[in-house]
Amino acid sequence: MRILSILAQKPSSTGSGIYLTELLRNFHLMEEEQAVVFGLASGEELPVFSGVKSYPVWYESENLPFSVLGMSDEMPYKSTRYKDLTESMLEQFRTAFLTACRKAVEEFQPDLLLCHHLYLLTAMVREAFPDKMIYGFCHNTDLRQMEKHGLCRDYIIKKMQALNRIYTPKEAQKEAVIRIYGVDPARIFNIAIGYNAERFHIPKEKQFFRDGIPRRREILLPNGEKVEKGESTDLLFAGKLGEKKGIFSLLRAAGKLAEEGRKIRLFLAGDNGNQKEKEAVYALAESATYPIYFLGRLEQEVLAGFYQFSDIFVLPSFFDAVPLTALEALASGNKVVLSTLDGLEAFFQEHCPTAPVFFAELPKMVHQDEMRKEDLPFFEENIQDAILSAMEYPYQKMADVSSLSWGSLCHKIVDNTAL
């Protein structure tokens, strides 16, 4: 099969970017022929995907003179918000991406187009290629964009209804797609997500044992400093260093644990394109009474080492689907703390019921991803309690998450009978 994948963002740094990259890698292992259209900022190095023909679209260029469009209002890199697009910017976006897509379709002659995000570019592609088989992937941030502002709303809804198939990570997103876009439920399939089993696994050498699950004995920080395992419980956060990923609440909750005499260290992997918010994170961390290590944005192979070193992965997001990082952490032997996002507990109960996942209850949110200031203490106490439960849990036997592999997911896409 000849498959053309399409993404308006960078093929890295975010969940959808990693999702795209892993599909490309696994379709290549399946010997499918592939091409890909994606966005990059001017001057960035062109990524190389083995066996895949690339059609990059350059932002911050003469034809597209603004930063990469982001499906979140705050991206881990410099970005433009969809709600800030003017008519001229919208036309520049349409022209730049459809030019690349038309070139890819003409040269590559795909049998199937895979469009990431049920949003603007996917709508444009559906309109431009009415006779092509097009599948759309919901990554949850598209739902948030549709509910937060009205950019091309009716146009997007109409074109999403015309997609041949839509994939959602879990039932909560399927229900939202039906509600927001009015799509026929028979064309929506819960496909879960996957993780890279070759990269994310328990350490195989230089092991350290606290419970029954081996941990990595030591790790090198980006600055070259070596950190060794000891008495402290090592917490890891990987994601955008922003409020809506729960970073401020995590810092305060961890501080309360330290005040109670719990020995902890916190490792923060990620960045924030919003400099003001990033500085606020660093400012709050300066007052911490426990060690905090800022790791910056890490390549996947480097992040894998920190999963193997840490004991508990914590991601108290205000809004998300199924975080890829949570699966990677579980596969690497971590206990995991997440917020009670819609349908998330049911997802883990269905796919890996023995996984050591602990939940911090979210209060009622405003506009899907905003928390009232008066609700923060409640949420942070819940994070503290969930981390404490994870710390006290005797993890003796690795949970099996092998069914959630990218290879399995790719076979489902190609083989319709698997759905």
Mark where each language-model region is:
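A charged, aromatic-enriched C-terminal amphipathic alpha-helix characteristic of glycosyltransferases
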Residues: 15, 371-418
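A conserved mid-protein helix/loop that constitutes part of the nucleotide-sugar donor-binding site
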Residues: 18, 233, 242-256
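A conserved catalytic-core segment of Leloir-type glycosyltransferases
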Residues: 41-100
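Carbohydrate-associated surface elements
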Residues: 172, 194
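Nucleotide-activated donor-binding/catalytic signature segment of Leloir-type glycosyltransferases, i.e.
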Residues: 278-298
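Aromatic "clamp/platform" in nucleotide-sugar-dependent glycosyltransferases that forms part
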Residues: 318
